[in-house]
């Protein structure tokens, strides 16, 4: 449609711009009204209206001047010479190009992703292949056909395609949007054309068959994962809680787990409760936020997560008193921060790149609650016998009815 309009650009009339402007604003208003907020946020909608209005004004002035030249008459804007009208057209074209560049810049900041150099992107290729080969060997020894792998700090949303492992992260315009919505509802990262496992708790990662985690340091072993392989500065950890691709869930649990009106922490605590946990799986612990950073003084050994208020800050850095650091990118997407396992007396600082105050809420993982919920799901599981891109076969011994 845009190309057809461009082909007939010289024949466009003043009234054509008015009609197109009204139609565009109307379409935008209808789209925003029926949007659920995860596709088109308020800030993005406001910016779209501003840019759309700018284009309409620029085109109206441009074609008004054009009609004045064609008709060679003086209209309401006063006596303007033909040469002046030509200058006015050039100015409007310049304004239009400037508005387009600003829109591209804004759109990238809202929906784009950080880039990395080719050198950095493939720097650890051999090490990745080495630990992934070890993961495959270990899985085969255990008779496991299917499992997923993720990185604690990925370079892009498509790292799985580069290194050749199966993940629960995808960047694609053809993805299932409902998966993205689910990820967002339970504190993971999601958007219009991607979903990412960032922010997953042990229960969620277990449900996604996430068996292995790749990290760039040897300090990530803890009660929920163990170090099983390493190559260079690349380390492979195996998660304690992993479910196979197929597992049974009680229909009563599915019906009762309505997370639509719950925040991401409440949604997970509710699921754990329905699966038999006697205590909340995630419990709030003290934290303090000031301009530029937030601090958590860990009182007891625990795996720590954190949520935060909506923010325009794009990146945060975690600094732990034991020497570990971790970077979080695109935090404006609003996912839960996985701060890792910390012992009593450890201090965790979360600094942001904009030197702004970002109020966080920290949570400690209750391992007993997580274990209870996991064991409930692990009671009836499917033993996979083969799989391909289009077919999965397996067997399961169902002792209690439910949904696979």
Segments from the language model and where they lie:
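Contiguous transmembrane helix-bundle modules in multi-pass membrane proteins
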Residues: 1-127
């Amino acid at each position: 449609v845009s190309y057809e309009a461009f082909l007939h650009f010289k024949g466009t009339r003043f009234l054509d711009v008015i009609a197109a402007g009204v139609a565009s604003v109307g379409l935008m208003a209808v789209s925003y009204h029926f949007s659920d907020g995860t596709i088109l946020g308020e800030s993005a909608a406001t910016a779209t209206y501003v840019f759309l209005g700018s284009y309409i004004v620029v085109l109206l002035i441009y074609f008004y001047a054009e009609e004045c030249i064609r008709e060679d008459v003086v209209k309401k804007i006063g006596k303007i010479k033909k040469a002046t009208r030509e200058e006015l057209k050039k100015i409007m074209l310049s304004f239009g190009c400037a508005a387009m560049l600003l829109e591209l810049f804004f759109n990238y900041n809202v929906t784009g992703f950080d880039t990395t150099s080719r050198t950095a992107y493939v720097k650890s290729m051999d090490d990745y292949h080495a630990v992934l080969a070890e993961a495959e060997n270990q899985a085969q020894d255990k008779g496991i056909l299917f499992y997923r792998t993720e990185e604690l700090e990925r370079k892009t949303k498509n790292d799985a395609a580069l290194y050749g492992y199966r993940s629960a992260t995808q960047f694609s315009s053809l993805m299932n949007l409902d998966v993205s919505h689910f990820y967002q509802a339970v504190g993971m990262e999601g958007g219009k054309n991607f979903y990412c496992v960032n922010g997953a708790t042990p229960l969620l990662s277990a449900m996604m068959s996430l068996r292995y985690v790749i990290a760039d340091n040897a300090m990530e072993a803890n009660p929920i994962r163990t170090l099983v392989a390493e190559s260079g500065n690349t380390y492979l950890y195996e998660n304690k809680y992993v479910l196979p691709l197929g597992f049974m869930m009680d229909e009563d649990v599915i019906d009762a787990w309505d997370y639509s009106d719950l925040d991401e922490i409440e949604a997970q605590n509710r699921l754990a409760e329905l699966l038999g946990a006697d205590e909340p799986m995630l419990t709030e612990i003290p934290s303090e936020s000031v301009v530029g950073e937030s601090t958590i003084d860990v009182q007891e050994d625990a795996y720590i997560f954190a949520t935060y208020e909506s923010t325009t800050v794009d990146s945060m850095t975690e600094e732990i008193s034991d020497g570990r650091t971790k970077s979080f990118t695109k935090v404006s997407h609003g996912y839960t921060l996985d701060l890792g396992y910390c012992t009593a007396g450890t201090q965790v600082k979360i600094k942001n790149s904009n030197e702004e105050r970002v109020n966080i809420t920290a949570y400690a993982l209750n391992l007993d609650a997580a274990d209870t919920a996991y064991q409930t799901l692990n009671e009836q599981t499917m033993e996979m016998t083969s799989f391909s891109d289009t077919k999965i076969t397996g067997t399961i011994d169902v002792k209690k009815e439910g949904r696979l």
